[in-house]
Amino acid sequence: TDSELRGLTFWTMGSFGGASWYLILPAIIVITLSMLWMIPSSRKLDLLQLGEPEAYRLGVDVKRLKYKVIISSAITVGVSVSLSGMIGFVGLVVPHLVRLLGGVNHSYLLPGSALLGAGLMMSADLISRTLIQPAELPVGLITSAIGAPFFLWLIFRIRKI
């Protein structure tokens, strides 16, 4: 039907229009458990930034840590995308922004990225719902409009072009 097609279109561009506590509560539980599972690995992730051989020499089981990160990320992303659709640039921009604000320590980077990402998404959703009332823009359009220029700035800043 027409409403199902509209819903699918909004899902592919990212939308919180169909959000309900019935769907969100299990997602909050799963994402919180995934974060709580990763935070104790913050120090190991910090050591991994030195390189795999160095982290291994410092006692990190690199292979196990990689599996843990991949599993946690896959669970978190899978739950998030299944509810809100594909929303671009948040996962790319937010961790870099947190690094700029608070450094590279993963004990701050992991929860900081979650909190700043949530704040960015709430702001983008507010903009998407109020910009052209009574219509609603897909939130993915707003995050792309904010994220793409920021990501380009980051690339140019790193390469000093």
Please identify what each model-predicted range represents.
Residues 1-161:
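Alpha-helical transmembrane segments in inner-membrane proteins
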